[in-house]
Amino acid sequence: MIAMVSKQPRKQRKARYAAPLHIRQKFMGARLSEALTKEYGTRSAAVITGDTVKVMRGDFKGTEGKVQSVSLMDGTITVDGVISTKVDGTEVPRPLNPSNVMITKLEMKDGRRASSIKK
């Protein structure tokens, strides 16, 4: 994919919607907590399943939980404890944008992720 040059919002949106998955992964970043920032020397990281996050914006502000799933196609994540109740009473996970959460605990089982964050 060619680097974005246009300032037009419609072309910015189109580029995001048409982006391949390996580019969409870059849109899944979230801020690290102050403790993690000091420990790893970086301000943000990509959210993966198993990370513990705190919701910073929206109706569920202050809620903390583990990431259940990550959807690159939708650009959203689902978190334990962030649920909406449908009219028929069933509970469904509420998708969140990763930019609205802060990572408080990293899942470090993946060796490649550990090495990329510890750079």
Swiss-Prot record:
Keyword Ribonucleoprotein: yes
CC annotations in GO: cytosolic large ribosomal subunit
PROSITE patterns the record matches: RIBOSOMAL_L24
Molecular-function annotations in GO: RNA binding; rRNA binding; structural constituent of ribosome
A Pfam family this chain is assigned to: KOW
Keywords carried by this UniProt record: Ribonucleoprotein, Ribosomal protein, RNA-binding, rRNA-binding
Descriptive protein name: Large ribosomal subunit protein uL24
Source organism (scientific name): Methanosarcina acetivorans (strain ATCC 35395 / DSM 2834 / JCM 12185 / C2A)
Gene: rpl24
